[in-house]
């Protein structure tokens, strides 16, 4: 039997989206899972890890289709064995402290620090403290697993991913005899195989955003007042991601402060969003349904093109948001509907939106 078939889509109408429902994982459930992991015998690779999985995201065990969220626990004195994979990571320490080695670079982190691990980097984690260490680790591995191209190695050679210094980018159109050259006057070019397999090199480094430094800048946004129509956040930006505004090439990570009794304006976007609330309490309204949350809760808050907004209650809220917006920017698929009274826009390929910050 042949491993293919024809599917006749002649005249087929596009079906409406079947959005997966939001989900709130309560702090108690997370704490119980942390304690369960801590009570297990130490595994051979040192990784006490539990993936938080939405029941409807399919292959890859994601909380969203493209976003994997793992609870990672290290007891005092423990470490993980070195490994590498072709997925990238954003880590967030929610309890304790520790350090990580990424291609030989050491990052010492405290509670609520954020750091990145570029793909195919050799990394290991350490808990040199006398407290339990807990991290939320966000990975794009669910996307790679859906594509059946997730590759991982345990205990690879420690120097195998050493990065050469970024070379000066040369205008390939002037390279002979294998240059890239215009085919027509309207912008169509041809590129030879020699350039295809040797694209311009972009150096990706592990980056670290210490919470105390981030908070000092973030708290200044409280002064914007209740008339401000935007969101009081900072993107933890890696310039290597360029126009896709990423923390990695797949995700952005933002830290938001939501002053008490603030209700955001409803909006929607095709990118999925996962929020971790680490101070305060409030609620989100997604497709007309209200979801309550408080500090320590994890939420799939925007399952793609769902109309949603968030609100704080009687105290300030701090939250980490992971969103797959950079991936959509790179794909040219980032529809964003900031003002529901107007039209959505394809961000990155058209002009975007503006806030009223200059007037508040």
Where are these regions (language model features)?
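Short amphipathic alpha-helical linker/capping segments at the junctions of internal repeats
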Residues: 112-114, 156-160, 281, 290-299, ...
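A structural feature that tracks compact, well-ordered secondary-structure segments
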Residues: 69-73, 99, 254-257, 264, ...
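Conserved short histidine dyad/triad with adjacent acidic residue
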Residues: 50-58, 68-85, 234-242, 253-268, ...
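Short, low-complexity cationic-aromatic patches
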Residues: 16, 59-64, 79-86, 127-131, ...
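A short beta-strand-loop-beta hairpin characteristic of the jelly-roll/cupin
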Residues: 75, 79-111, 118-122, 126, ...
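Contiguous mid-protein beta-loop-alpha structural module that forms a pocket-lining wall or clamp
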Residues: 120, 125-180
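A short, N-terminal "cap"/entry segment at the start of jelly-roll beta-barrel domains
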Residues: 1-65, 161-250, 346-360
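Ligand-binding loop in jelly-roll beta-barrel domains
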Residues: 119-146, 303-332
């Amino acid at each position: 039997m042949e491993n293919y078939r024809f599917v006749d889509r002649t005249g087929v109408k596009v079906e409406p989206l079947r959005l997966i429902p939001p989900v709130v994982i309560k702090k108690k459930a997370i704490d119980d899972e942390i304690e369960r992991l801590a009570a297990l015998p130490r595994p051979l690779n040192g990784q006490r890890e539990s993936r938080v999985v939405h029941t409807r995201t399919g292959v890859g065990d994601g909380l969203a289709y493209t976003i994997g969220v793992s609870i990672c626990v290290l007891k005092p004195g423990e470490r993980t064995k070195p490994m590498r994979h072709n997925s990238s990571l954003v880590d967030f320490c929610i309890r304790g402290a520790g350090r990580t080695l990424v291609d030989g670079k050491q990052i010492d982190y405290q509670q609520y620090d954020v750091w990145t691990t570029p793909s195919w980097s050799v990394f290991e984690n350490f808990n040199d403290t006398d407290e339990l260490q807990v991290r939320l680790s966000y990975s794009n591995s669910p996307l790679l697993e859906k594509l059946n191209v997730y590759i991982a190695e345990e205990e690879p050679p420690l120097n195998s991913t050493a990065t050469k210094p970024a070379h000066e980018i040369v205008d390939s159109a002037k390279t002979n005899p294998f240059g890239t050259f215009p085919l027509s006057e309207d912008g169509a070019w041809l590129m030879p195989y020699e350039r295809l397999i040797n694209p311009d090199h972009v150096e990706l480094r592990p980056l670290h955003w210490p919470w105390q430094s981030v908070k000092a800048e973030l708290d200044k946004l409280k002064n914007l007042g209740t008339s401000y129509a935007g969101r009081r956040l900072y993107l933890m930006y890696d310039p290597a991601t360029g126009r896709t505004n990423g923390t990695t090439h797949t995700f952005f990570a933002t830290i938001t402060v939501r002053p008490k009794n603030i209700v955001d304006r409803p909006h929607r976007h095709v990118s999925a969003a996962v929020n971790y609330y680490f101070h305060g309490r409030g609620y989100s309204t997604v497709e007309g349904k209200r979801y309550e949350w408080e500090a320590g809760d994890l939420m799939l808050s925007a399952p793609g093109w769902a109309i949603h907004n968030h609100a704080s209650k009687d105290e300030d809220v701090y939250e980490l948001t992971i969103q797959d917006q950079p991936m959509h920017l790179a794909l040219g698929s980032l529809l964003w509907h900031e003002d529901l009274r107007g039209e959505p826009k394809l961000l990155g390929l058209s002009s975007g939106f503006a806030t009223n910050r200059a007037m508040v």
